[in-house]
Amino acid sequence: MKTVNGNGVSIGSSVGNAYVYLNNVDLETEGKIVFQDAVLKLISKFELQIKNFKDNDRTEEADVLDAYILILQDPEITEQITAENESSVKEVYGIFDSSANILASMEDEYFKQRAEDIISVGKHLINTMQEKVVTVELSENSILIADDLTPADTSSMNMGNVVGIVLKDGGPTSHAVIVAKNLGIPCVIGVGESIKEIQNEDIVALDGASGELTINPDKKALEEMNKTKKLEE
């Protein structure tokens, strides 16, 4: 049993099995689709996800993806992609990464969040260029573990099986907080490098108020947590 502390950003507690979501980007495999075509394809995908969110009264998440489309259409980013580098994933991702680093260095939380948005869009664009499909199979009572999480990630997941979210990074304005609140599930952010302690299928108990996580709790701790959860219900 191991205890990890982060920042609780939603009420409630839950116990479930860890699903570690790795949204890594592969910069060694060249793109099968050139930059401009990939942008159009990704915008179409985001537009479909926006419609689905709006149809389910999840307007905040739809607004996030609207902002993602604006990033893809931002001339300060797109005009840096030259014709000879339209298939170079390193070149494309490097431009998104540089733009994000400028904003991340600023003090304002708004700009830090926008930096995370640019990185997220860059990752999704690289996957689109490579025609990479990310498949996530979430079983019932899953605790979703990730470095960061956005509506672009969760829109293709069966979030009905998720009972909690744990993030390595993020602040109170992170998009994962919006997702968690809309779904009514606890969320703990900012656990840092301690997230590496969590493996797939570990039992994880989290308290969305205190920010405390317990990895593989013993029988006594698990009984206490289940009692607390019943009182909340």
Regions found by a protein language model. Give the residues of each.
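Non-catalytic, soluble scaffold/interaction modules
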Residues: 1-233
